């Protein structure tokens, strides 16, 4: 069997390429996913939603590969001075102009408070840095998404401000009371201001308020299918606790007809929901029920307790029972030959003479990255992109 592991809660580290010091903090909202991170998860080269396709057409794919760099280096709390009206989602940077497109069909995430009245926001960060604050703003009632987002479209005060939070497993987890009286679709605007640097990060988060009074679930992220899978493939949802230990595993071998990109997430979700009371997959309704849908990206993974993360493993059947690709010692390229053709599963020979295989999406985008960081066996972050065979 050919084994792929798509880690949806832990994504590759992207290091700053323009600073002399070691690591430069980057990040974006993971739960609910920010606009840029959600489009990245759809696949930079072939996004699924019309809005993300339009963002790529307007600004190119690099903006999505750089999902954790929507920032201003000299903000120092003066956010309205460095991020102009109409450019909030792209932080005033030309690279991210596609995120500023004024349209009503940006994919949104349904959110609702838990039993204590809070919602847990999860921010994915690449390095621990001192935080001055995380501020959360919400659009005013009557906001028109078909007009460019301006500062005046936001409520004047943040509905939540976090000044002390610890980085755990690459994420900041923040419990916030949701704003009162909001219904339907809105944009949450998040600002992360560092205290050890004037740098700040910005994120537009498209949400819809479900109207649920008490939500018993914690959202971990979307279950996304990038492509159809062959019949006979096995997909496994793995749930890890706060210590990184396997808490649950749910496997399903796909039958013909249940292996399409819209069908296999539904089939896996139905099995998980039948077998587990801790984790459910689907779309949350106003009454706290999680129902699976036939979709490549709309199903969310929910747990009843905080502190978990998930991963989806995919095993593909090998025709004729042969070895996995690369098992015969052959390679597709001698690195860095054919660099722009590298994709998930590409096997290369590194400078050390060893064979490396490009990891599955979403890591596969880094296989084409700068050799200083992603040269197999040599780059500073090569293990984010490659598996040693």
Swiss-Prot record:
One of its GO terms (cellular component) is extracellular space. Can be detected in the extracellular supernatant as a 43 kDa protein and a 23 kDa protein, both proteins have the same N-terminus. Only the larger protein binds chitin, which may protect it from further processing and/or degradation by elastase (lasB). It is not clear whether the short form is functional or a degradation product. Keywords: Chitin-binding, Secreted, Signal. Residues 1-25 form the signal peptide. The keyword Ribosomal protein does not apply. Gene3D superfamilies: 3.30.70.2150, chitin-binding protein cbp21. Its main location: secreted. GO terms for molecular function: chitin binding. It is found in: Secreted. InterPro entries: Cellulose/chitin-bd_N, GbpA_2, GlcNAc_Chitin_IntDeg, Ig_E-set. CDD domains: LPMO_AA10. SUPFAM superfamilies: E set domains. Binds chitin but does not hydrolyze it, has no detectable protease or staphylolytic activity. This is Chitin-binding protein CbpD. It comes from Pseudomonas aeruginosa (strain ATCC 15692 / DSM 22644 / CIP 104116 / JCM 14847 / LMG 12228 / 1C / PRS 101 / PAO1). The lineage of its organism: Bacteria, Pseudomonadati, Pseudomonadota, Gammaproteobacteria, Pseudomonadales. The gene is cbpD.
């Amino acid at each position: 069997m050919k084994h792929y592991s798509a880690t949806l809660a832990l994504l590759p580290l992207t290091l700053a390429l323009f600073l002399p010091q070691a690591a430069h903090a980057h990040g974006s909202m993971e739960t609910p996913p920010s606009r840029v991170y959600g489009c990245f998860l759809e696949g930079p080269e072939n996004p699924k939603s019309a809005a993300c396709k339009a963002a790529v057409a307007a600004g190119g794919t690099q903006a999505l590969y750089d999902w954790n760099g929507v920032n201003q280096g000299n903000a120092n709390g003066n956010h309205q001075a460095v991020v102009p009206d109409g450019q909030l989602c792209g932080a005033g940077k030309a690279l991210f102009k596609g995120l500023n497109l004024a349209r009503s069909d940006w994919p949104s995430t349904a959110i609702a408070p838990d039993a204590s009245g809070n919602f847990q926001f999860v921010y994915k960060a690449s390095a621990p840095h001192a935080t001055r604050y995380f501020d959360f703003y919400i659009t005013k009632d009557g906001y028109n998404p078909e007009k460019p987002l301006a500062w005046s479209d936001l409520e004047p005060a943040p509905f939540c401000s976090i000044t002390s939070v610890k980085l755990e497993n690459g994420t900041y987890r923040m419990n916030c009371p949701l704003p009162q009286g909001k219904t339907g679709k809105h944009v949450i605007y998040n600002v992360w201001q560092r205290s050890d640097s004037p740098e700040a990060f910005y994120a537009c988060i498209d949400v819809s308020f479900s109207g649920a009074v008490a939500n018993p679930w914690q959202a971990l992220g979307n279950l996304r299918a990038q492509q159809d899978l062959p019949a006979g493939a096995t997909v496994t949802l793995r749930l890890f606790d706060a210590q990184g230990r396997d808490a649950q595993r749910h496997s399903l071998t796909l039958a013909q007809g249940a292996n399409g990109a819209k069908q296999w997430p539904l089939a896996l979700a139905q099995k998980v929901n039948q077998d587990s009371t801790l984790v459910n997959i689907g779309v949350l309704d106003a009454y706290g029920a999680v129902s699976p849908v036939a979709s490549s990206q709309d199903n969310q993974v929910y747990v009843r307790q905080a502190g978990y993360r998930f991963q989806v493993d995919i095993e593909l059947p090998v025709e004729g029972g042969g070895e996995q690709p690369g098992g015969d010692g052959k390679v597709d390229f001698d690195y860095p030959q054919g660099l722009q053709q590298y994709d998930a599963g590409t096997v290369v020979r590194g400078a050390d003479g060893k064979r490396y295989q490009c990891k599955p999406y979403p890591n596969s985008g880094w296989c084409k990255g700068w050799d200083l960081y992603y040269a197999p066996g040599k780059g500073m972050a090569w293990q984010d992109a490659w598996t040693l065979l």
